[in-house]
Design a protein with these regions (language model features):
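Hydrophobic, well-ordered beta-alpha structural blocks that scaffold small-molecule cofactor pockets
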Residues: 1-109
Length: 109
């Protein structure tokens, strides 16, 4: 995985595509990278969808059917991305859903 540290690269890339507020689905190593990279930037993590509490960030259970609007939800549970994406689409959410892994791999330096 690319190293993102150094000067808020991830937040700049998200802001370029109009993303200011995100949610993360799943608490994985990718989640830890996203939290670290976005801490103190202009991009806010509004919540994480996970059954266990994540320190310092609002947590919504995976069983929830209602989600606060965000600009983008990044699914960090990459091994279950397709199933999670299909489940979330059934709720008629208005925001974009993307694989966190694919999103991060698609960033250009």
């Amino acid at each position: 995985m690319k190293t993102l540290s150094g000067g808020g690269y991830l937040s700049r890339e998200l802001l370029k595509i109009g993303v200011r507020n995100i949610a993360i689905y799943g608490n994985t190593e990718i989640t830890k990278v996203l939290v670290k990279e976005l801490n103190g930037t202009d991009v806010q993590i509004l919540y994480i969808v996970e059954n266990e509490r994540v320190e310092g960030i609002k947590t919504i259970p995976r069983s929830s059917t209602k989600f606060e609007d965000v600009d983008l939800m990044l699914v960090a549970d990459v091994s279950n991305f397709k199933q999670i994406e299909e489940k979330l689409k059934k709720f008629g959410l208005k925001f974009k859903i993307a694989s966190a892994y694919e999103f991060l791999m698609g960033l250009k330096n």
